[in-house]
Amino acid sequence: MIEFKNVSLVYPNGTQGLKDVNLKINEGEFVVIVGLSGAGKSTLIRSMNRLVTPTEGELLIDGENILPYSSRQLRKLRTKVGMIFQNYNLVKRSSVMKNVISGRLGHVGTFASLLNLYPKEDVALAYRSLQRVNIAEKVYQRADQLSGGQQQRVAIARVLTQQPKIILADEPVASLDPPTSHQVMTYLRKINKEDKITTIVNLHFIDMAMEYADRIIGMRAGEVVFDGPASDVSEETFEEIYGRKIREDDLVGGQDNE
C-alpha cells in the first residue's frame, strides 16, 4: 500500500508542487492521475520513488515512511518501484536486450552489470519480458533504430524485468500517436491485471483515462481535487478538475480520433 499523509512539497524556487495531499493507493490498483500541465501530476508520481522529496508530511510504502531514507535505502526502494518515462529513458546506442536486462541492475549490482555478468535466469527473464510486449524480434537491434512506440514497449519490458511491486508511468503516451498510445496502455493494463502490480499512470487525455483506469485522481495546483472510481466520473468532473470547459485537444487520445 502507498499512503500520503499531509504531504506537501515546495520547490527551492518557492513553487508549491504538492499541497496537503492525503491518499491511499491499495495493492494491485490501476490508478490514473489527470490534471492540466503544472497541476502536480509528475511531482506526485515522482515523490513515490523519491525522485523529488516532499518537504512536509509522511509518505508510506508498505507501512514505512520513505522520506527520511538514506541513499542505500533509496536504492533498495527503487528496485521494487519501477518507472516508465515519457521520453523512454533508454540507452540509445545499446541493444534492446542490454536496455531490458538493465532492469536487473538493482538485483545484481553495478560491478556485475558493467561486466555484463547477468545470470542465465535474468537473460531468460528479459527475453520473456520482450515477448510479453511483442517486441522480442528486435532483441539485437539498437534502441535508436526503433520507433517511439517500440521504444516505449522496450521500456515496459525493462520494468517487467525489474520485477517491481509498483509501476509508475509518467506521461507514458504523451509522445505517441493515438493508436500507439492505446497499444502501450493496453500492455500496462494487462501487466497490472496478470501480475497484480500496483500501477499509477499520469495521463493528459481524459477519454484514455476513462477507458483504462479503475480509479481516477484529479489534481489542480498541487492539490487532489477528485479521487474516485472511473465509473463515477463525468464531463462535469473533468471540468471541475481542470477549472475550465473541456476542449477537443483534451480528447485526442480517443479511439474515434485514430
From Swiss-Prot:
Function: Part of the ABC transporter complex PhnCDE involved in phosphonates import. Responsible for energy coupling to the transport system.
Name by which UniProt lists this protein: Phosphonates import ATP-binding protein PhnC 3
Record family assignment: Belongs to the ABC transporter superfamily. Phosphonates importer (TC 3.A.1.9.1) family.
Membrane topology: Peripheral membrane protein
GO cellular component: plasma membrane
Residues at which ATP binds: G35, L36, S37, G38, A39, G40, K41, S42
Catalysed reactions, as listed in the record: phosphonate(out) + ATP + H2O = phosphonate(in) + ADP + phosphate + H(+)
Subunit structure and binding partners: The complex is composed of two ATP-binding proteins (PhnC), two transmembrane proteins (PhnE) and a solute-binding protein (PhnD).
A single MF term (Gene Ontology): ABC-type phosphonate transporter activity
Pfam families: ABC_tran
EC number of the protein: 7.3.2.2
Record keyword Cell membrane present: yes
UniProt KW keywords: ATP-binding, Cell membrane, Membrane, Nucleotide-binding, Phosphonate transport, Translocase, Transport
Subcellular compartments: Cell membrane
Root EC class: translocase
Organism: Halalkalibacterium halodurans (strain ATCC BAA-125 / DSM 18197 / FERM 7344 / JCM 9153 / C-125) (Bacillus halodurans)
Occurrences of domain ABC transporter (ranges): 2-246
NCBIfam families associated with the record: ABC_phnC (TIGR02315)
InterPro entries given in the database record: AAA+_ATPase, ABC_transporter-like_ATP-bd, ABC_transporter-like_CS, ABC_transpr_PhnC, MetN_ABC_transporter-like, P-loop_NTPase
